[in-house]
Amino acid sequence: MNNNLSNIKKGKYFLDKHNCIGLPTETVYGLAANAYSNKAVLKIFKLKNRPRNNPLIVHYHSLEMLKKDCIVNKNFLKLYNKFCPGPLTLILKLKKSSKVSKFVTNKKNTLAIRFPSHPTAIKLLKILKYPLAAPSANISSRLSPVTKKHVEEEFGKKIKYVIEGGNSKIGLESTICLLYTSPSPRDGSE
């Protein structure tokens, strides 16, 4: 696994220019883009052939950054302290002042968020000034990729860069948890 700083900076370079990149996480590789950029987020939908009414998960590295976009409550903090970082996606209320692209949420007032535990994803998120919209790096309805090679085979030259991060350890998408309803919208790795 080669997650040295030059590879991470190269990923940042493409993200800053509103491009999509492949990003390793502990669950599966993600197709990542600046969650604050309409232009970048729309590229995710096009590349994945994903319906725009299917909201995206946004990855954060810190609670402070998350609080700029979402309303945080006691129930969230309990789950955050127990399971984050890790393969759990939580759905929170979006703040009206949030910069998250309306295309990420399909104009809804909620946002699916998670804190990945993969060291490469964490290092990249820490040097960005924005969170990453990052659903699985596959064409919608196909198997989710667990290696850099899988992402490259899926998208070829349609994406600018894939950061090497070794095999995803879990190989299954994160569990999604709504904090104000049940059952879970999607069961996953936790």
Each predicted region: which residue ranges?
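N-terminal low-complexity segments that are often proline-rich with Ser/Thr-Pro
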Residues: G188-E190
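Active-site-adjacent structural elements in enzyme catalytic cores
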Residues: M1-S182, R186
